Regions:
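Gram-negative outer-membrane beta-barrel transporters
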Residues: 146-151, 168-285, 358
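Signature of Gram-negative outer-membrane beta-barrel scaffolds
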Residues: 1-81, 105
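Outer-membrane beta-barrel signature, preferentially recognizing the C-terminal barrel domain
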Residues: 9-14, 63, 92-143, 148-151, ...
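Transmembrane beta-strands of outer-membrane beta-barrel proteins
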Residues: 32-36, 70, 84-86, 141-144, ...
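Residue-level signature of outer-membrane beta-barrel architecture
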Residues: 20-26, 66, 74-78, 90, ...
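C-terminal beta-signal and adjacent terminal beta-strands/loops
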Residues: 276-286, 308-361
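Outer-membrane beta-barrel channels and translocator barrels
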Residues: 27-29, 77-81, 125, 137, ...
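Outer-membrane beta-barrel translocator domains and adjoining extracellular loop/strand segments
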Residues: 44-52, 97-103, 110-112, 154-161, ...
């Protein structure tokens, strides 16, 4: 954190909850479950003088909330190894302490000054999902799902340009948003018989996950947001900062993971090649609807990990080799408008290679 009047904070969350659930077979192959969770939470956050931590807090706020959270699922086992699952639930999401504490600190990942907003509220979710599941064997499956979420007061990041030309980031609750999309997962272990010892002696793995997500902010006339940029809370009109129909901050349309690997139990070796893709997303809102948002482009990344167990004089060792970011993908964050691009936090991540050795005692 940065030194200053409030370079330290103390925060706490105390939750008490009770739940009841009924699970029953409605008819052969059809099972239902319904439950209700009651939760009460006391949240407190205060900022302190680092040189006088026992003195009265510079700022203090406490909030108590009660929730009733219902949930229901319906599962149809229409085949021995296949089923359809439907779910409906209400859940909550709480801001992180660092998003709440009105204290400046430097984010080491973005090299940007961040300060929390103590007036953030919990996000409430209504979740609807449907999923088809096919299990080939233990730990091996194919699933296909669709989901919808309605969010009230989602937390978003806001980037404010300071007089020094650098961005300072804080947080706020957007009025509401809708998210919907689909997901496919596949995981398969198999052994090959090619007559080649190097191939035949290994158990091979293919794992794939792809998620498509789209979202939109819901902003109406009269909606406001609460900001704490200067130490004094303000409630500007939401339309000054947000446009209805925009994507949620932090949401990528496409997320994909491909994992290829093998295991050799006799040799004690394991290798994994991991390919990930994340499409562009809004990393932070700009301080006006007339200014472009900050956008990240994570792109494609490839990692490789190899491990092997061996013994030396009766002692067990594990050697490892790791290669990260083989594609050399750079970090990109920028604003774009009028066919021009201004990089706000773009840099070369580089590639990393490491060797490791561990002993078991």
């Amino acid at each position: 954190s940065l030194t200053g009047d409030a370079a330290m904070y103390d925060a706490g969350l105390e939750v008490a909850a009770a739940y009841v659930q009924v699970d029953s077979e409605i008819r052969p192959l059809l099972r239902g479950s319904i439950g209700l969770r009651y939760e009460t939470a006391d949240l407190s956050v205060k900022t302190l003088d680092i040189f006088a931590p026992t003195a009265a807090p510079i700022f203090s706020r406490s909030v108590s909330k009660d929730y009733l959270l219902p949930a229901a699922t319906l599962t149809w086992n229409f085949a021995e190894d296949q089923q359809l699952r439907f779910g409906l639930s209400q859940t909550i999401g709480r801001p992180q302490f660092r998003e709440l504490a009105p204290q400046r600190y430097r984010d080491t990942e973005t090299d940007r000054i961040l300060s929390g907003n103590p007036y953030l509220e919990d996000t409430t979710f209504v979740n609807v999902d449907a999923r088809y599941e096919h299990y080939f064997s233990k730990g091996q499956y194919f699933t296909l799902g669709a989901f919808y979420k309605n969010m009230e007061k989602p937390v978003e990041a806001l980037a404010v340009l300071g007089s020094d030309g650098a961005f300072r980031q804080t947080f706020y609750n957007a009025p509401a948003a809708d998210i919907y999309g689909g997901e496919v997962e596949f995981k398969k272990l198999f052994e090959l018989e090619t007559g080649t010892g190097w191939v035949d002696n290994r158990r091979w793995l293919v794992s794939l996950n792809y998620t498509y997500t789209t979202s939109q902010l819901n902003v109406s006339d009269g909606d406001t947001i609460t900001l704490d940029i200067t130490g004094v809370p303000t409630t500007p009109t939401a339309r000054d900062y947000l446009t209805g129909g925009e994507k949620l901050q932090g949401q990528s349309d496409h997320l994909a993971n491909l994992q290829l690997g093998f295991e050799n139990d006799e040799a004690g070796s394991q290798a994994t090649l991991l390919v990930t893709y994340t499409s562009e997303r809004v990393s932070a809102r700009s301080s006006s609807v007339d200014l472009p948002d900050l956008v990240q482009r994570p792109g494609i990344r490839v990692d490789f990990v190899y491990r092997r167990n061996f013994e030396i004089q009766g002692r067990e060792f594990t050697g490892s080799f790791e290669a990260r970011n083989l594609t050399g993908t750079d970090a990109e964050e920028y604003q774009a408008a009028g066919g021009k691009r201004f990089d706000t936090n773009s840099f070369d991540i580089g590639q990393s290679f490491s060797l490791g050795l561990s002993a078991r005692f």
